[in-house]
Amino acid sequence: MKNNWRRRLARWFLIAVAVAFLITALPVVAMRWMDPWYSAFMMDAALDASRSGKTHYHTDYRWADLEQISPHAAVAVIAAEDQFFPFHMGFDFKSIREAVRSNEKQAKRKRPKVRGASTISQQVAKNLFLWPGRSYVRKGLEAYFTLLIELTWPKERIIEVYLNVAQFGDGVYGVEAAAQRFYKMPAARLGRYEAATMAAVLPNPITFKVNAPSNYVVKRRDWILAQMRGLGGAAYLDELENPTEPPKTGARARIEAKRK
């Protein structure tokens, strides 16, 4: 009798796991071809604005295919956020270890932990499917969705979705909406300067402004421009389809040299 109960419990557990996997995996697989109408972060921000009584809040989200986006925009966000994006499977473990060490040093000095190591794939996972905040549960789900995305989407699709769901201002999502809002031009016409400025606010697009850059944003923009040159500019996007070993020149080599 007791064995029958255990078998039934195990069977229901396996069924529950299978159902949970299907419910979470199907949207990820579908979004390889279907453009997302909304993201979890957009929904959370809209709900927060409603609770706060922000009656004039508006979500500005305009999808643009990768071919309709300046290659400078893709290179800028890769240079700013995840220079080894073409070469990893969603997680940059060396950057994670460096971030842990850096934040431990900051903690000893009683300073805030300021360094993160989220890859572009991880940011897509949390922006699309999860909620803001920090917890072990959310980080576990983020890792799960990141792995699903990397297994089912090509790199070109990951960067395309990222460029469309990343936040560049209060209620402004995606490079098309940001380009139209801040530069009065379509994303296809963004130059290196505009793209680097937009990428410079990504750590905190509410505090930092594309149209009113602080000293920090200006310095970060200039750093991103230098990194874009070191990566080889738009030619670096060829690595998304046919990744090779990172060359020994440019920004990637300098980072790799520090890691060894």
Show where each model-derived region lies.
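Juxtamembrane regions of bacterial inner-membrane/periplasmic proteins
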Residues: 2-260
